[in-house]
């Protein structure tokens, strides 16, 4: 679209492929006209080039190898921050004395990781792809350092939030770099390789978290990010060069900032905080009908309405662009990913609690018992990526994966005190296989049906859905866990003070309540079953949402919205 064209919906000049007949003065006049109208240039047309990289621009050989390696390292550490904490949480609750803030250890990271996805996606549109990725990595490293030195729970939560902000930029930028570095037909293979880094972090996370928590300190769960992230930064600095299709928009800084939609991001953050706090207080420190809990829930609804109105008002500048969200190739896989990822993260955070509290294993032992799930996840990620690359089949794989995951999580729900090894090994393998085979397919579908200028934005939307699913699901699961446990303890161990139980770390319940341990374990198990039930429901709903995803093969649709 040439610069002199007009968007009929906005009646504003669009910044598209440069028209050589347009003078520099004309360009300046158009920019000034936009500024006087109080609107920034519509972001979806704001590219120097709407084309994917030319064939000779794709890196090859050693350069491609190192670029993919760097993105795998970056993916490894931002994913490790999601998987390593689950095993470390019982030890963290011991040091910071309580279960009341457990949901924040995961949700603070998911909140900023998800909330800033679209803004970071736009940052890659308006600023250098390479520079923005490196700055995001630096922010992530700062957050990890804060987590490592945190003197209390609040400092740890703050560090997690900062790390999530950096992780948002790294995730969007990493997959955008892969998209611009690989030909469309080979893209599923490389995203599968990056997915294997996620799987590797899933394998290493519980083991590393358990080893550090047992033998050194849980703080090393965060220190480990520093050298790995530094290596990834050096590789990107040397080997990656932004292609012509990824040139940033030439627009005034004010317009770039306006298009980041920081108001929308702030509303989303407030929305998530209200939800988490309501679930944290409800039934634990406050009754569900208390003014504080009701106020938070009312605030959640009010902010949600305000966010919808604000996003509609901003139009093309919004964090959530209506033009893109109307496409079935984006909203269907995004919704699928919200529920699918939410279900997985519940298992990721609560299986270690099951093993360490119910089975009385050490953190290392808990990590070892998680291996059936995480090893399956790692191996199957590569196989799934290769299959999709070879066949182009996407939606059927999503449905089959979600169906298998539903069966697997349903079987995990049947676990109880003293469940034999054969069941907790086999059920984890089944669930993991179901979760991994479709994990990256929503990303493949969104990218294969996006124009070059929309690549980073649609990538961000998938990550937004994934991480918000994690934030909401982990918070809901924690609320269900604690409330169910407190209700159950009144009958299984009536002499135990419920508030004392909440204030006791998951690995200390036997030492703290030796005379009532059987009743405490029954209460813990009831709470864990409540979390597993939520996991089953979410992945089951994801399976239904998969039916709405377009059934076209990915081959032949890359680079230009094949279906709407």
UniProtKB/Swiss-Prot annotation:
User: Which residues get glycosylated?
Assistant: 37, 289
Ranges annotated as biased composition (Basic and acidic residues): 1-10
Q: Which domain of life is it from?
A: Eukaryota
Question: What InterPro entries does the database record attribute to this sequence?
Answer: MFS, MFS_dom, MFS_trans_sf
Question: Function, please?
Answer: MFS-type transporter; part of the gene cluster that mediates the biosynthesis of gregatin A, a fungal polyketide featuring an alkylated furanone core.
- What family does the entry list? Belongs to the major facilitator superfamily.
Q: What is this protein called?
A: MFS-type transporter grgE
Tell me which species this is from.
Penicillium sp
């Amino acid at each position: 679209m040439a610069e002199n064209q007009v968007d009929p919906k906005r009646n504003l000049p669009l910044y598209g492929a440069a028209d050589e007949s347009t003078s520099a003065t004309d360009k300046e006049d158009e920019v000034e006209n936009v500024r006087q109208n109080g609107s920034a240039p519509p972001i979806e047309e704001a590219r120097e080039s709407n084309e994917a990289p030319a064939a000779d621009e794709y890196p090859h050989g050693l350069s491609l190898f190192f670029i993919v390696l760097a993105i795998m390292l970056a993916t490894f550490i931002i994913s490790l921050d999601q998987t390593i904490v689950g095993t470390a949480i019982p030890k963290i609750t011991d040091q910071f004395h309580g279960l009341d803030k457990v949901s924040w250890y995961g949700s603070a990271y998911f909140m900023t990781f998800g909330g800033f996805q679209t803004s970071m996606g736009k940052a890659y549109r308006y600023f250098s792809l390479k520079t923005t990725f490196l700055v995001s990595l630096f922010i992530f490293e700062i957050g990890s350092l804060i987590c490592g030195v945190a003197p209390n729970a609040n400092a740890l939560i703050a560090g997690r939030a900062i790390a999530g902000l950096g992780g948002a930029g790294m995730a969007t930028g990493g997959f955008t770099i892969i998209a611009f570095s690989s030909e469309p037909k080979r893209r599923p293979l490389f995203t599968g390789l990056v997915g294997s880094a996620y799987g590797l972090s899933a394998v290493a996370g519980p083991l590393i978290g358990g080893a550090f928590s047992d033998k050194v300190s849980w703080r090393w769960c965060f220190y480990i990010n520093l050298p790995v992230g530094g290596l990834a930064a050096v590789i990107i600095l040397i080997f990656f060069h932004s292609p012509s299709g990824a040139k940033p928009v030439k627009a005034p800084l004010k317009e770039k900032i306006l298009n980041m939609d920081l108001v929308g991001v702030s509303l989303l953050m407030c929305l998530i905080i209200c939800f988490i706090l309501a679930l944290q207080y409800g039934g634990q420190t406050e009754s569900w009908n208390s003014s504080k809990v009701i106020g938070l829930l009312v605030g959640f609804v009010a902010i949600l309405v305000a966010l919808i109105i604000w996003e509609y008002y901003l139009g093309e500048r919004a964090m959530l662009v209506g033009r893109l969200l109307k496409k079935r190739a984006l909203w269907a896989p995004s919704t699928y990913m919200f529920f699918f990822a939410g279900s997985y993260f519940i298992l990721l955070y609560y299986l270690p609690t099951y093993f360490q509290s119910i089975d009385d294993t050490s953190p290392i032992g808990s990590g070892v018992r998680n291996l059936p799930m995480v090893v399956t996840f790692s191996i199957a990620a590569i196989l799934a990526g290769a299959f999709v690359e070879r066949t182009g089949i996407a939606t059927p794989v999503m449905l089959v994966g979600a169906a298998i995951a539903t069966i697997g999580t349903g079987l995990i729900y049947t676990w109880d005190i003293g469940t034999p090894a054969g069941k907790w090994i086999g059920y984890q393998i089944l669930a993991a296989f179901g979760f991994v085979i479709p994990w990256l397919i929503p990303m493949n579908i969104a990218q294969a049906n996006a124009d070059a200028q929309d690549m980073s934005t649609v990538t961000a939307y998938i990550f937004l859905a994934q991480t918000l699913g994690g934030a909401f699901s982990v918070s809901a699961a924690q609320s269900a866990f604690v409330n169910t446990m407190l209700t159950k303890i009144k009958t299984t161990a009536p002499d135990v003070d419920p508030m004392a139980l909440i204030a006791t770390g998951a690995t200390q319940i036997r030492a703290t309540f030796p005379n009532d341990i059987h009743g405490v374990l029954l209460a813990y198990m009831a709470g864990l079953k409540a979390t597993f039930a939520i996991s089953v429901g979410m992945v089951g709903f994801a399976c239904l949402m998969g039916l709405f995803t377009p059934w076209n093969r990915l081959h032949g649709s890359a680079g230009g919205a094949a279906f709407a």
